[in-house]
Amino acid sequence: MNSAVEQELAELGIEAYLSQHQHKSMLRFLTCGSVDDGKSTLIGRLLHDSKQIYADQLEAVHADSQRVGTTGERPDLALLVDGLQAEREQGITIDVAYRYFSTQKRKFIISDTPGHEQYTRNMATGASTCDVAVILIDARKGVLDQTRRHSYIANLLGIRHFVVAVNKMDLVDYSQSRFEEIKEEYVTFSKKLNNPNLDISILPLSALEGDNVVNHSAALAWYKGAPLLEVLEDIDIDADRGNGEFRFPVQYVNRPNLDFRGFSGSVSSGEIKVGDDIIALPSGKKSKVARIVTFDGDLPSAQAGQAVTLTLEDEIDISRGDLLVKSTSNLTATDQFKAEIVWMTEKGLQPGRQYDIKIAGKKTVGQIDAIHHQVNINSLETFVTDELPLNGIGLCDVSLTEVVSLDRYQDCADTGGFIFIDRLTNVTVGAGMIQNLSELSDVAPINDNVSAFEVELNALVRKHFPHWGAQDISKLLS
């Protein structure tokens, strides 16, 4: 048993400890930044100094440090996170590693993401479920291309809180002037992200020495702010989750007996109360919320992030993939939209190919109609391309084979984010974030004189010259 848990159990008793732990707020954060900036070491230091490591784990780290460690005689705390053999041999992070710990104020889930450019898809996967991004910068090197890339991806995936940790301050003699120089450089860069809602905290630390990670440090006496752990404990994410209109994607129809029929899932955004008027989409049927059921009993209301079962006053047809919203909701139903897409497979994304698309609990079919541009995620400049490669990020036009109720990703990640699934291999090949939605419109049929040659020529133009913005005339044929 680790010493922190043992101490709390002795003070509170088992029941009080479990009750306190259950009602703590949860914060999900990821560590990201350039290669060798010390991301895994920082997580190891957080776990070590907050007394979250079991005795046998610490013994294993001491033993492994002598074999594959990079810190000399001291234990290599990065080995607490880098568990793959290839990671330990190369001294880098490849896969996304998850670790869990708690303090007296909050529970944490940490995603340790890789820094190398070829693992951009892994980083995007880790960021997609996080509330906060801890972005590490090597005090010797300053802001690098990979720092900019990870900041861009974290911002793209809707993370609103950045904690910029200037690491390895021990290697620059804890220089305040060097810290201020890096701070100014990052603040200047962050303005290019064009996100006025971004909350950025910047602090100095040394993960290797433990300075300003969990406790204040005499070596950084000139820094008057809080250490990293305290900053993470005080970030208010509940306000972010409560914003927005009510969205409830139905994941499961719960019918244990003939007398109960409920709809289970997690509240994606907003709040719902007993008695609220709701609409089930896509059917458009209306009803009222009769009960909000949980394992611990009924609730009068539920907020974003809570997993609940809703029962309705009326028996209406609702199935997995349907969406429950309030009757006053302003939601766009469309089959076309623009989205930022992160491509995750060796075979590049090409316009015109159909994929299974999963949005919240709903599965449909769609395709890329055009690629407007790809983003150089190091410089944030854009350039024209006809194919999106592995780890590429670009703005694309997407069309679906049916009308679906959607949000912009920045308004609701669950109903504004989606994944591409290869229809032959069933492999997830890409992820998308909806930026703009197209209103449904009645299109006049094209003249019957359109030939097969013209349809084929139109397809070639859309494939090789997507920046021209040509529409798919085959869809307009009556």
From Swiss-Prot:
One GO MF term attached to the UniProt entry: GTPase activity
EC number from the UniProt entry: 2.7.7.4
Subunit structure: Heterodimer composed of CysD, the smaller subunit, and CysN.
Ranges where the record places region G2: 91-95
Species in which this protein is naturally found: Aliivibrio salmonicida (strain LFI1238) (Vibrio salmonicida (strain LFI1238))
Coiled coil: none
Catalytic activity: sulfate + ATP + H(+) = adenosine 5'-phosphosulfate + diphosphate
Lineage: Bacteria, Pseudomonadati, Pseudomonadota, Gammaproteobacteria, Vibrionales
Keyword Nucleotide-binding attributed: yes
Functional summary from the UniProt entry: With CysD forms the ATP sulfurylase (ATPS) that catalyzes the adenylation of sulfate producing adenosine 5'-phosphosulfate (APS) and diphosphate, the first enzymatic step in sulfur assimilation pathway. APS synthesis involves the formation of a high-energy phosphoric-sulfuric acid anhydride bond driven by GTP hydrolysis by CysN coupled to ATP hydrolysis by CysD.
Region (G1): 33-40
Enzyme type, top EC level: transferase
GO annotation (BP), single: sulfate assimilation
Keywords: ATP-binding, GTP-binding, Nucleotide-binding, Nucleotidyltransferase, Transferase
Residues the entry annotates as binding GTP: 33-40, 112-116, 167-170
Protein name, UniProt field: Sulfate adenylyltransferase subunit 1
Region described as G5: spans on this chain: 206-208
Gene name linked to the record: cysN
